[in-house]
């Protein structure tokens, strides 16, 4: 113990207190155990409450000790001793009577407050809080109101990081809340996940506090948050208390929290318990105070409508009213129509009274589906072919369209994920949709019989028979199963046309080798009853190549070209983990992708390159999103590509972009069984385990979205790859454009007559070949035209000397800037590099960075024009 502390504690020499604060912190904390022992002796003395000198000594020593501990960062070493002193102090009264017989803070209360303040200063330090919280909770039972208030604030702060430590004292905290310490209500949601049983037992008393006028709005919101957590874990405990919540649905401050409770109950299949609150939900839907919650209210009403036919009619009435009142808001209108379609697939009779309203809406896919529910005998309208209105393309021609989007480059073929942030998914195939609608209306007929290939061909060409004579008798369907790896089905409808209709027959290669029984699910989807699938002999010319490449050489496998129109409707299973993840985060994904696209675009495709003995790397590809220029640099046939160090982030973004496009265009989610999802998953599986860390693809994409720090890594990678030298963001349409589309005035030199003349000329320094770093720069005079890049050894060539073509623009594979990116390229700020088809490269350096950028842009536009002329 320092001698000044000894004089102060043992001899009560208050005159050394000023010198004590000038002593080094490390000298003060020496022999701390003896110091605390002396403090406890003084605090426990019977004369302490009345001895002013002892009180001053203790206050000075405690202040000096806590300051030394704080400044030296040794709280973990001395927390136990500080807590021990606090425990000794709390054994004494916290209030005392003054001369006016009023309750005031006792001397012990002042020391307790100082110790609590010092300990809870480290509320994020779990070892310290583990020791402090059990003793601090004793303060809640004190008769000193100010001490209880301060302790409550400390515990509320500590609960953010120490919910598990507090959870063992859940019953004590709940008891304090019920007795009137309402500020502790904010703590309850933090400790519930680690100790649920006390909350379930005391839930009735906690919910009663919602009606207490002394509980403020923020505390009531915490109670509703707690109720939502209970609804997610043990909904049956909460359901009896739901009538107490109904009044708060019309409160602007509390409606959002209550709607979250309802959504939690719906996710737990307790929708039926919400039917009694439909009148209040309708009032909320019609009020302008809840305009931000209309989408959520719409979904809740629709889920209630699926419970029974009477509720369906009532729900549809309200949803139609919402559609009328929100016709100008396309997002809400799309959500309402999707929910009406979902109700109509289960209770089609609920839609009949609103048929005139649906017919007044603009024609779209969702309106067609709703109108299809309205006609109980719609088989003829849906299944027959109208030559004037419907396409007469055969199944083979539709399949061939799919492969028009395949990109072939060298020895590999890659498949596009999406084209741009606003790319649309293909519409549902009419035949498949018609078949689903027919079997929805006839789902009571049970299992469907099988039909031979001959009968299929006969029914497809049955133009002279009465409409659906075969279907009305046997209600048969043929189903061709894809190979098991694709997990998709192709449904063949049976159109019966009039005498003027064109007869279509299936090629022999499309003969199904095994038929599969199907059934209609509650959501209106046609699915197999069960059993395995057998492979089918597909046409020899139909191929599909998925990216990335398989381990080893890149190969192309034979498979049926599945029409993307069918993909939306096939096996969209509600038990799909990915489906559920996206379904509950639609708006969040749309907002997130919108923010990301403002910083950088999402790749349109990816490949994995590497052989058996080489390192596998993922290559990502970008294209111009506008393509407004006739010389667009980066089109479907020529993409900007580079190898990435962060495949997980890029695949995550590609997945979110895929879902965002589907949600925006159709209001639906792309599930795990879709071809787009499986393509991305296959790319992930082909990466080595050193990159994937053996994490499943669905686990990776359902994790937290990449944060701003992760996005900054990708922006830096794009910068190093020269992306921002080739693309710019167009703020007017929120798209990333190539140089040609951003600067259309530069394109006219290439596309107008006389474009073969000089476009750009000047002196550049050049290096080429191997070991370039050992060579000197050679100054040459370059001339760029729409056909070639020419150069001469003359500094200023005369008109009589023609420049010989040096590099044909059609032979240039790529050109990139060396002025951005890695620090090692600081000396090449004014340079750019050209790669040719014969695997040679040339580095050219301009007089300044602006001139180098001009050469780079003109070269890119000239290359695009040359490729276009060659095509």
UniProtKB/Swiss-Prot annotation:
Gene3D superfamilies assigned to the protein according to its UniProt record, in alphabetical order: Pleckstrin-homology domain (PH domain)/Phosphotyrosine-binding domain (PTB) (2.30.29.30)
Membrane association type: Peripheral membrane protein
Pfam families: PH
Compartments reported by the entry: Cell membrane
GO biological process terms held by the UniProt record: regulation of signal transduction
Annotated keywords: Cell membrane, Membrane
Domain (PH): residue spans on this chain: 757-864
InterPro entries named among the record's database cross-references: ARM-type_fold (IPR016024), Melted-like (IPR039888), PH-like_dom_sf (IPR011993), PH_domain (IPR001849)
Entry GO terms, CC: plasma membrane
GO molecular function term, any single one: phosphatidylinositol-5-phosphate binding
Primary subcellular site in the record, as a coarse category: membrane
Cross-referenced PANTHER family: VENTRICULAR ZONE-EXPRESSED PH DOMAIN-CONTAINING PROTEIN HOMOLOG 1, VEPH-A/MELTED
Domain writeup: The PH domain is required for membrane targeting.
Similarity-based family: Belongs to the MELT/VEPH family.
Protein name: Protein melted homolog
Species: Caenorhabditis elegans
């Amino acid at each position: 113990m320092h001698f000044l502390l000894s004089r102060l504690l043992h001899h009560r020499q208050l005159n050394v207190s000023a010198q004590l604060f000038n002593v080094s912190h490390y000298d003060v904390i020496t022999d701390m155990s003896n110091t605390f022992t002396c403090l406890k002796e003084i605090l426990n003395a019977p004369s302490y409450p009345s001895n002013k000198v002892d009180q001053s000594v203790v206050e000075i020593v405690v202040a000096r000790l806590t300051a030394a501990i704080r400044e030296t960062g040794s709280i973990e070493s001395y927390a136990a001793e500080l807590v021990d002193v606090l425990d000794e102090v709390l054994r004494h009264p916290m209030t005392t009577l003054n001369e006016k017989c009023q309750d005031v803070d006792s001397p012990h209360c002042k020391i307790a407050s100082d110790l609590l303040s010092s300990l809870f200063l480290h509320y994020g330090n779990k070892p310290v809080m583990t020791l402090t919280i059990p003793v601090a909770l004793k303060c809640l039972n004190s008769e000193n109101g100010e001490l209880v208030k301060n302790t409550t604030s400390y515990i509320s702060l500590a609960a953010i990081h120490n919910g598990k430590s507090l959870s063992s004292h859940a019953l004590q905290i709940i008891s304090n809340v019920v007795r009137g310490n309402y500020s502790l209500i904010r703590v309850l949601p933090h400790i519930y996940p680690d100790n649920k049983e006390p909350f379930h037992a005391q839930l009735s008393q906690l919910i009663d506090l919602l009606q207490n006028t002394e509980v403020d709005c923020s505390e009531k919101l915490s109670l509703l948050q707690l109720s939502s957590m209970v609804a997610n874990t043990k909904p049956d405990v909460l359901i009896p208390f739901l009538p107490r919540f109904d009044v708060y649905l019309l409160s602007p401050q509390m409606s959002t929290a209550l709607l979250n409770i309802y959504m939690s109950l719906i996710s737990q299949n307790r929708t039926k318990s919400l039917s009694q609150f439909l009148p209040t939900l309708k009032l909320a839907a019609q009020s302008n105070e809840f305009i931000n919650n209309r989408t959520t209210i719409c979904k809740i009403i629709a889920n209630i409508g699926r419970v029974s036919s009477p509720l369906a009619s009532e729900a549809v009435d309200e949803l139609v009213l919402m559609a009328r009142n929100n016709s100008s808001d396309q997002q809400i209108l799309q959500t309402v129509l999707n929910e009406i379609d979902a109700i109509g697939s289960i209770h089609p009779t609920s839609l009949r009274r609103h048929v005139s309203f649906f017919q007044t809406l603009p024609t779209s896919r969702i309106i067609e589906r709703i109108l299809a529910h309205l006609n109980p005998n719609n088989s003829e309208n849906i299944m027959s072919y109208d030559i004037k209105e419907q396409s007469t393309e055969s199944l083979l021609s539709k399949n061939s369209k799919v492969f028009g989007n395949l990109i072939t480059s060298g020895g590999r073929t890659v498949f596009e994920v999406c084209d741009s942030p606003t790319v649309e998914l293909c519409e549902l195939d009419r035949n498949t949709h018609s078949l689903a609608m027919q079997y929805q209306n006839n789902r009571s007929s049970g299992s469907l019989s099988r039909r031979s290939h001959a009968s299929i061909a006969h029914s497809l060409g049955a133009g002279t028979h009465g409409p659906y004579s075969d279907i009305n008798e046997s209600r048969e369907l043929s189903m061709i199963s894809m190979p098991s790896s694709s997990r998709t089905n192709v449904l063949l409808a049976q159109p019966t046309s009039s005498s003027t209709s064109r007869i279509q027959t299936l090629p022999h290669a499309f003969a199904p080798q095994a038929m599969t029984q199907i059934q209609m699910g509650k959501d209106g989807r046609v699915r197999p009853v069960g059993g395995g699938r057998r492979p089918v002999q597909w046409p020899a010319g139909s191929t599909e190549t998925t990216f990335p490449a398989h381990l080893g050489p890149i190969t192309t496998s034979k498979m049926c070209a599945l029409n993307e129109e069918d993909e939306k409707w096939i096996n969209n299973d509600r038990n799909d983990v990915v489906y559920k993840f996206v379904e509950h985060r639609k708006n969040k994904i749309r907002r997130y992708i919108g923010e990301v696209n403002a910083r950088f675009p999402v790749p349109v495709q990816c490949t994995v390159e590497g052989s058996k003995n080489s390192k596998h790397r993922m290559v990502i590809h970008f294209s111009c999103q506008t393509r407004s220029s006739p010389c667009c640099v980066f089109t479907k046939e020529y993409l900007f590509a580079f190898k990435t160090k962060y495949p997980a982030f890029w695949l995550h973004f590609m997945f979110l972009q895929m879902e965002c496009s589907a949600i925006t265009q159709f209001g639906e989610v792309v599930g795990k069984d879709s071809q787009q999802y499986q393509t991305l998953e296959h790319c992930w599986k082909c990466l080595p385990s050193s990159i994937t860390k053996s994490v499943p693809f669905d686990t990776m994409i359902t994790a937290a979205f990449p944060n701003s720090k992760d996005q900054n890594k990708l922006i830096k990678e794009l910068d190093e790859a020269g992306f921002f030298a080739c693309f710019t963001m167009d703020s007017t349409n929120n798209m990333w454009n190539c140089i040609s589309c951003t600067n259309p005035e530069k394109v006219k030199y290439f596309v107008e007559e006389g474009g073969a003349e000089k476009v750009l000329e000047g002196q550049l320094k050049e290096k080429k070949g191997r070991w370039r770093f050992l060579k000197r720069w050679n100054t040459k005079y370059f001339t760029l035209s729409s056909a070639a890049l020419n150069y001469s050894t003359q500094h200023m060539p005369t008109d009589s000397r023609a420049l010989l073509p040096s590099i044909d623009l059609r032979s240039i594979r790529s050109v990139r800037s060396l002025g951005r990116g890695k620090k090692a390229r600081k000396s090449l700020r004014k340079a750019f590099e050209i790669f040719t088809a014969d695997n040679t490269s040339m580095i050219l350096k301009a007089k300044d960075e602006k001139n180098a950028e001009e050469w780079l842009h003109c070269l890119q536009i000239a290359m695009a024009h040359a490729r276009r002329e060659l095509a």
